């Protein structure tokens, strides 16, 4: 690491943080030297025509080269690059860097043969199979821009993304497999194309043995057949500021936003993160138990581990029921995983089905050094459960689709800091996190406000929203000039630790008091009978809003629901005060969630308020909403 700024009595973290804060160009120039450029950047930071900071604008490189070819050139071609483990099909497969490079080069050739070139968009609608990662890397190889959509997403949502991205081709598979259910993808893709005003020229279909798709001879291509005839394609040089991908994230209103990621800043930031945040050596085994359709899958299944020369794991399964709550621990044991990264909801599911950690005891986790969590607030009961059962450090960190890597975390490769439950620790070097009030003034420690990032944002953060720069300006930059507004509320404590209390929308107003539902969830979720919970603000004529709790019990727990409600009401009252007006907690079998594990609080609130609502496209199981309606009718 660097020791660039400040006196000798400063910690390693403080030195690194201040170097990045005070001399961002010098700091990021040093980090950029850790990747293999075709032409090294002479300019480190420059504003574009919209006044947005762009990193390494004259650097020339290729992300697929960094992830694959570079390691082969360095004599690491026989090292394991990717392990595919699929409990839903019983398949397991390992790819070396050379094998992965050769297959990606041929898929790039297969795309090129259909006219796909630099700057073209390609929609990737795939299950969690190796070909999904290969498709992404093949696009990167050509300088084409991939837009990955969760496999199985509803046709109308896929259609909206097709219309916005205007892809030349779509890459899909015949089906996905959810636990034991086969979901044919082809009818969903056909319907999306039919509904979209934009028509892609070709659709590549990867035929899986579990289900064969019928092809439309005019438009569809058999992936395996095209691959067998394809010639390998070399890496196309691109500018650091050329887009690598578009990833759609749900907007609070209207159509989804296409977050644009550039090539150079992304590669530099991810390479830095693997050592600074995750402390993984080259050749280490990194497992992000996520999906390639989500930003964590983009950054930490596909790009960062491969750029860093690690082994990455692509897991086609779930934390539970594939076949049991020991799935995560089996994978960690079998492949000697160094670091595991998933969302708190995955561990809550494991805890619910195996509260005593019986399955975990069957596996050897001696190789596992750290467990990282992100994607939603890590509630202290989940943190404590995972820590006590695994005896491993559990590290919460906070970031967004928009940034592509962590904004705040425990930088284990620079300096491991003491963990504070409920906090994602401190800002990562490169980010300046400030808490602002409604007027844009910084607030005192321990005071809640808008979590904002002072510009310039570090490399990898979005420079715009795809074909809608106004939306980028109004959604993120215009509220407080000179800052990027994250949309989250939270506070910094007296030690500079960041506490994210949830989306600004999750702050409720009870009789003029602004209260965080996240804080209430922390208290409710701390009850020994409860596996997970959600608190939403519902309309009240007298007080404006009142909090309402929904709780899921741990498996096997039997309680008197009224008595439990009384205990929870008492708990919130004693810890927040009567001002919270927390009076009701309803027991449900499960909470409605997105496929990436976020609880759909807004939809729950709309149902509770009797409002019209649309079923979110990102929902994992729409029938979970009926459950909420049912308990509210009681």
What do the predicted segments below correspond to?
Residues 78-80, 203-206, 211, 215-248, ...:
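Conserved pre-ATP/AMP-binding loop-to-beta segment of ANL
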Residues 426-430, 441-476, 515, 612-613:
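Conserved ATP/PPi-binding loop(s) of AMP-dependent carboxylate-activating enzymes
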